[in-house]
Amino acid sequence: MNLPEGTYRIRNVDSGLVLQLEGASRVRVGPDGPPAPTAARRWLIAPVHSGGGIFHMVSEDNERRLDVANASTESGARVQVWRANAFGAQEWIVEEHLDAPGVVSLIACISGLPLEADAEGRVRQGEDTDSPSQWWRLEPA
């Protein structure tokens, strides 16, 4: 996907909630407003390599990258933020849904599994079910 580098809110299609940082490393979805500070709901999305289609997603709040915990390849592994490193657990493919303009899936390069949010607001990677809990909108912030 040709995605311009920039700062975005990442909104879950199913719940309408935004991806946000809680504390130092915990990532959840929550309302687009208090109690989370604005920076905790904003993500710099930048290509890993120019033209490669793989991206880092960096929290504006603490400048840490969206990361699959322990570089897990298992379905259900939690997603967090972590300091920059050279592992594929911090690299994401932004896959556009051609049948739903503006909707994307965020695929973890380490596992090939999509980012999803559950009903309790937890964020993890999971088996691809092609469901709205795994669909996201990238809204320029």
Regions from the PLM with identified roles:
Residues 1-141:
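Lectin-like carbohydrate-binding module/patch detector with strong preference for beta-trefoil
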